[in-house]
Amino acid sequence: GINDLNYMYSGANLYFYQLSFDYIDNDVYVQIDDYDELDALRTTNVIENSINIYIVADLAPGGESLCGISSFVSSDVQGIVMAESCFALPDNPSTLSHEVGHYFNLLHTHTGSSDQNEDGIIDGSNAEYVDGTDCSNRGDDLCDTPADPNLGDFVNSQCEYTGDYVDGHGDSYNPDTSNLMSYSEKICRNTFSLEQEDIIIYTLLNS
């Protein structure tokens, strides 16, 4: 986990290390079923001035199993919770880095792209356009991450995008399947853009 994290964040010149390990002897937190449990866990055994990461057997606060969930800078309760099935595995080296990206205030590259009409057009009110129009105010608000229609189920084993969605201008998507903040295949994700790295550093130094 830490080795993968350090590899993924090397471009931002960040290095992480494990400060300590605590076992929470409470069966309530083995399986997280709702957001109250999630917040209660993230207020347990908190170590200040560090990223508190909690590993549980099953993480399904909204009824659907998740690999991980993280706070943002503005969140009332801080910390990252990971499902053990998604932590530090050869076929999933990226989920922890993805969640730490959220911790540093990065958005999904497909932010705003959840709405699709019956013709396969991504027409969400905040969806980023392929040509980059108003890119600093759409999607993830970054201009060096290509428009992303949400890559879940649309990336093959060669890390190629297989979808055929078009944006509100009728342009076909050419997303970055390697970006850590996407929903690409977990084995494919290993990069941040320069603007993403800038946000990571800014958040670290100013929050």
Predicted feature residues:
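Extracellular/periplasmic catalytic domains that process cell-envelope and extracellular macromolecules
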Residues: 10, 42-49, 71-76, 160-175
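Propeptide-to-catalytic entry region of secreted or membrane-anchored zinc metalloproteases
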Residues: 1-51, 55-59
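A recurrent domain-boundary module in secreted/ectodomain proteins
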Residues: 192-207
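Short catalytic/ligand-binding loop motif for oxyanion handling, primarily in non-cytosolic enzymes
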Residues: 25-27, 61-62, 113, 190
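Structured segments of extracytoplasmic/periplasmic soluble domains
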Residues: 1-12, 103, 107, 203-206
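The catalytic-center signature of Zn2+-dependent metalloproteases
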Residues: 87-190
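Active-site-proximal segment of zinc-dependent metalloprotease catalytic domains
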Residues: 41-114
